[in-house]
Amino acid sequence: MIIDKLENAHLYKNLGERISKSFDYLKQTNLKNLAPGKYEIDGENIFALVSEYKTKPESEGKLEAHKKYIDVQYVISGEELMGYSPLGNQQILEPYKEENDIEFFEGDKSFTKVSAGMFAIFFPEDVHMPGIAPGKSSSVKKLVIKVRTN
């Protein structure tokens, strides 16, 4: 897992061409004007999902992990807590669904506040819980870039 500000994205170019393309998209796109939906960047290798939602209490969140895609989660506006734990010590809540590339878990995690202009990268070995309210519920607009691992 990596959490940082977009202005430091150049530090992560060595993570591969697809991650680099993801950061280029974040820097070159007027993100505030993007409507919720799916945006193709490089076919099914790299695509973006824009969503707007209200953050929720931790009790309503689920730890999740993906096998085929890395998540580059960028907060366009608002702020949220993102939970994280290394994959391995959790109990499976819902088994892996290949069609959605998602598996749900329960277990220990730690939280970090991610605000507008910040990103989090979650790799397949990172269990994460996004969208959690840092206190009371608030509105968030977020772009998640899905980066194929192979």
Task: Indicate where each model-derived feature is located.
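Short, conserved beta-strand element in jelly-roll/cupin
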Residues: 68-80, 88, 95-100, 146-147
